[in-house]
Amino acid sequence: MHTQSAYKNLSALQAYSLRLYDGLEAEIGQKVGSHIVGGFFLAQTKKRMEEFKYLAGKFRSIGLEYDLVSPSEIKSKFPLLNVSDLEGGAWDPEEGYVDPYSVTMGLATAAKKNGAKIIENTQIDTISRLPSGHWELTSGDHIFECEIIVNCAGFWAREVAEMINTSVPITNMEHHYLVTENIPTVEALHNELPIIRDTDSHFYLRQENNGLLFGSWEKDCRAAWNGKSAPWSFGQELFNNDLARLEENLAMIFHRLPELHSTGIKQITNGAISFSPDGRPIVGPMPGVPGFFVACGFVGGIAQAGGVGLAMSQWILNGEPELNLDFMDVARFGDWTTKEFARERTYEIFPKRYEIIYPAMERQSGRFLKLTPINNDLIKLGAIMGQSNGWERPLWYAPDGVEARDELSFQRPNWWEHVGNEAKGMALGCGLTEMSTYGKFLITGSDALEFLNYVGSAKAPERSGKIALSLLLNERGGIVGDVIIDCRNGNEFYLVGATLGVLFYQRWLEAHTGGFNVKIKNATSHYAAIGISGPNSRALLNSLSNNCFDEFPYMTSKDLEINGIACRALRVSYSGELGWELHCPISNQKALFDALMNCGKNYGLVLIGSRAMGMLRLEKGYRSWGAEITTEVTPHAAGLQRFCSSKKNYIGRKKIDSEKKTPPKKRLVTLDVDLLAPPCWGDEPIFSNGELIGYVTSGGMGWRCNKMLAVGWIDASKIGIGDMLEVQILLQFYNAKVISDPIYDPENQLLLN
C-alpha cells in the first residue's frame, strides 16, 4: 500500500486512504493491522532510474516524498537483498500494508456507527427503473427501492452492469502470491523490513511475520474462470496453483533474494484480481444512466479504497468530486471497449504492471477498432497511428527512409524533429490535419438556444453561420470542457469538442436538459473533419471551391462544396494560423481528402499529426482538455475569462463574478524554458527562489518561435510577466521565464487574415 501513482490525483486519494486507516483505530477502538514500514522501488537500468527521476519531480510537486537511493542504501535497510546488478532505487517512506479483513471490518463498523445499514449475503437478481426515476432491486422475494446505485461488485461488475443493459470493461485474472516459512535472518532483525518492488523483474515483496510474502505479475497470464463470468456462488475459494507459469518470474525473485533457495514455502495462493483495460480504477456516473454509479477495477484496492470512497461520496452528494478524476472516470470508455477488447488489452498490460511509463506511450493490443475512411491512406503516407477514445489517429508522419515507429524516451524522442518539420512546413505553406475523432454533437429543439446559453459560458450564436467558443462549467466554476458552437439555424446547433471528452461532454449535457425541449445527438461517428491551416490555406481551398473562401470572416461557417463535395466549413484554427475545419458526412471524407491532397501539391501542403498540433497550440496560449482544462481550473485561472458572458445567467456564473472581484491565487502561465532543457511532459515542479510554487501541466517545442515552452499551474500571487523561475526536469533545474500569451502572432494578424 503506497501513495505513489502515475496520476497525481490518484496519489492524493491513496494518501487519504493511509490517513483514514491510521485514524480508524482511534475512531472504532480496534486495530486494523496497519504497518507503515517504507518501501523501495528497485532499478536495474539507467532508463528505470530516469523514470524514477521523473516520478520524484512529479511527487515533489504535490508534496510527497520520493527519494532516489543507491544500492548500498537499499542493502542497509534490507540486508537479504542481492543488489549487485542494481543501478539504484527510490524510497517511499509512507509505503506500508494493512490487514484487508481488519480494514474492511473497521470501515464497516465506522459506517454503521454513522448510520449506515449493511445487508450481507444478499444477491441482487434484477435491477429496473421505476416511473419515479428510482431503482427497484430484487433479491429472491425481497424488493428494495433506492435513488442511487453504486456498482462496486468487483468480480461481478460487468454482470451487474448488464442488468441495466450497459457494460463495464472488467477482466478477472488469476494471480499468485507465495508465503515462506520463517527465515532465521528475518527473525533476528529488530525492525520490520521495508516493502520491495523490483520493477524490472516485475515482483513485489514484504515481510509476513518472520517470513516473506512475494508475488509477481505473471508473464504467462491467465483469465480467471477461463474467461467466463465469476460464479455468483464464489466466495473465498482459490484456483489451482500453476507454478509452471511462474518459473521465469520465480527465477528473478530467487536471484534477488538468494536466501530463498534454502527456505521452504508454506503457502501458495492463486486468487482472482480485477483489471480494467488500462489498469486504472473505473469510477463515476455511468453515461446515459442517471443515478447509476460505478466503482470497480481496483488492482490496488486497499490503497485506493479510502480515497475513492471519499471521491464517490462527493460525486453522489455534490454532483462531482473535488479532484479531477477524468483519468479513472468510467466515461473514458465507450462502446468500443468490448469484452474482447478488455481481455486483449489486459493480457498486454498485466505482465507489464511495473513497466516504465514513458511520455506519449501507446498500446499495441486492441487496436484498429474505429477507423476513418482515410486511415489506410495516412498510413501509406508515413503516419504513425495512436489510439484516442477508440479511434485511430495520426500522431506524426515519418518521412521516406525513416522507420515509422515511436522510440520512447523522457528526453527528446525520435519523432521530435519530424514533428517540428510538420509544424514549420505548415507555417510556410499549409497543413492538413485529420480531425474526425473530435467529439461532435447535434443540439436540436425549440429550446436549443436557451439550453446552450444555460450550459455554456459564452453567448450562443443566434444566426446561422455564426460560431462561438463556449466553456462548460460546473457550479464551482471548474471547466468541464470547451466546445465550438456552430449555429445551423435557430433551433439546430453543431458542437465540436475534445476527442477524449466525448462521453464526458455528453453525460454533462444530458444531465442538464431538465426543463428544456432539447435533443442531444452524439454525431461523432457520422461526420468526418479535416483541418486546413497555414498562409496558403485560403488559396488552396479557393482553387477547389470557386473562391468561396474569400469573404469568410473568422468564427463564421458556411455550407459549400469542395471539388463537388458538400461540406460545412468552420473558420476556426487550433494551430493559430489562417485556417478552416471542413466537416462532411464520413462517407465523403475519402473523396474530400483525395481532392485536397492532389491540389495541395501546388500550395506546399504537408500532413500534420496530433503531436505537432499539441505543440502549435502552446505558442498561441491555447489550453488543452485534460491538461489545462479540468474541473479544478476556473476560466480566470486558465486565462479564459474572455469566453464568459456578463450578460446572461449560466452554470458557474456566480463563481465567475466572484473571481472578477477576487482573482484566484493559482493560475496558468506560459513559461519560456531553457532551450537546452529536456521536454516538459507534465507534472514537473516549478520553483521561485527555491520555493515550490506549482507544477507543469504540459509542454513542448514552439517550433515557429524556436522556444522550449511549458504551461505552468502556479501560485501567482507574487509572480508576474518577465519573472524568472526554475523548472525541475529529471531532477535538474532549468531557468524558465514567465511570458505573456500568445508568444506567436500576438496580435492574431495571421489568424484573422
Where are these regions (language model features)?
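Central beta-strand plus flanking loop segment that forms part of the substrate or channel wall
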Residues: 1-5, 39-41, 165-191, 248, ...
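Dinucleotide-binding Rossmann-like beta1-alpha1 core, especially the glycine-rich loop
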Residues: 2-77, 200-205, 211-213, 347-359, ...
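Short Gly/Pro-enriched turn/cap motifs at secondary-structure boundaries
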Residues: 168-170, 193-197, 203-204, 264, ...
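Flavin-dependent oxidoreductases
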Residues: 127-240, 248-259, 341-362, 366-371, ...
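Glycine/proline-enriched, intrinsically flexible loops and inter-domain linkers
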Residues: 323-324, 329-753
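General small-molecule cofactor/ligand-binding pocket signal
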Residues: 67-69, 117-119, 263-266, 519-523, ...
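C-terminal catalytic lobe of FAD-dependent flavoproteins
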Residues: 100, 200, 209, 223, ...
